[in-house]
A protein has these predicted regions:
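Small/aliphatic-rich secondary-structure junction motif
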Residues: 1-52, 59-68
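Short, flexible loop segments at boundaries between secondary-structure elements
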Residues: 122-132
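Glycine-rich, Arg-bearing micro-motifs that act as flexible, cationic patches
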Residues: 96-115, 119
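Short secondary-structure boundary segments
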Residues: 35-36, 97-99, 128-129
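Structural beta-alpha unit
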Residues: 62-94, 132
Length: 132
């Protein structure tokens, strides 16, 4: 069993990671961090760069959590990658960070969170970044 978190290097991604880490500690299970890009990782700001990956690994190691980092560039979109990781690692929970989007933005771009919420076979925890 595991907790899967969809991670992007953003305030929303950090909020999701923090919540997922707490869930993993409470459940005594493994954390699966999914960070993916469909296209060119050099221009996709959602794709963690090498220094961000190192920082993420250090943070997870320091917390003493069993973890797996899936950092991929494939043809599948983020929702497909998160759902595939959840199935592969028998997730008991998926954690996602949410951000505000306009109705038009949702219509044109689609929503990774919406697809995961609708298609996941386990509970999904959706969190927002703290407001400052």
């Amino acid at each position: 069993m595991s907790v899967v978190v969809g991670y992007v290097p953003s305030p929303e991604g950090e909020a999701a990671l923090e919540h997922a880490m707490r869930e993993v500690a409470q459940r005594a299970t493994r954390l699966v961090v999914v960070n993916t890009s469909r296209g060119d990782a050099l221009v996709d700001q959602r794709y963690a760069q090498p220094d961000q990956v190192r920082t993420l690994e250090e943070k997870l190691d320091a917390a003493g959590l069993e973890h797996v980092l899936q950092h991929t560039i494939r043809g599948r979109d983020a929702a497909e990658e998160i759902l595939a990781a959840a199935a592969e690692h028998r997730a008991e929970l998926i954690v996602l960070g949410l951000r505000r989007r306009t109705p038009v933005g949702k219509l044109i771009m689609g929503s990774t969170a919406q697809r995961v919420l609708l298609d996941a076979l386990c509970p999904v925890l959706a969190v927002k970044a703290p407001t400052s």
